[in-house]
Amino acid sequence: MGTNVEPDAALMLRVKRGDVRAFEELVEKYKQPVINVIARILRDQTEAEDLAQNVFVQVFKSADRYKATAKFSTWLFTIARNLCLNEIRRRSRHPAESLDSSQSDQEGLPARQFEDVKTFSPSDNALHGELEEKVQLALSELPENQRTALLLCRQDELSYEDISEVLGCSLSATKSLIHRARETLRDKLKPYLRTGAWKNNQD
């Protein structure tokens, strides 16, 4: 098995044997990507940081059940997604507790998350801030499964095949979710894309 095991899976197998240093390496590598995914699913940066800790606690506790047949990052983001869904369900049962976190406080969703978003010059800072706000709003209005699929797609570690495993749906369904999410965002963000519409709106 050894030569076919990816480096992250090899680290996790060491964790399975009680190697704390290997666990620390995985946390160091994946902590920020996990926080980013959770923050954009829940739209709450502070809660994302707390929930990310729970993700890695779960990883450590589940080490005995880990098998190197699946890509480590797929397994990791599946845990993160499940905890996010649990939190979303909790919020739906206790909506009053979630009012303060309904507006994202994360420090800006980078415009590079979407290839078509226009790049602004330094003099356009105010407009760029408005763009980030519009992107956040458009993301928040996507159905949960589309938003999750799209955000997972933006993580370099996850392919369509990986995402389909995380979401528990077919490859074609995954591609459809991501396609519909992108189409919805393009439609809502048309004034801010590289079509010249932004400038037209400012005239």
Spans of features found by a protein language model:
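Short, charged helix-capping/linker segments at alpha-helix termini
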Residues: 1-3, 16-25, 35-54, 171, ...
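C-terminal edge and immediately downstream basic/flexible tail or linker adjoining helix-turn-helix-like DNA-binding
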Residues: 2-4, 96-100, 107, 112-113, ...
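Amphipathic alpha-helical segment used for protein-protein interaction
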Residues: 13, 17, 92, 102-108, ...
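Sigma70-family region 2
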Residues: 16-17, 43-44, 56-71, 90-91
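Amphipathic, Lys/Arg- and hydrophobic-enriched alpha-helical face
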Residues: 27-45, 62, 139, 188-191
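Structural recognition of an alpha-helix C-terminal capping motif at a helix-to-coil junction
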Residues: 50-57, 70-82
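Arg/Lys-rich amphipathic alpha helix in sigma70-family domain 2
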Residues: 64-68, 78-99, 191
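DNA-recognition helix of helix-turn-helix
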Residues: 85, 89, 138, 146, ...
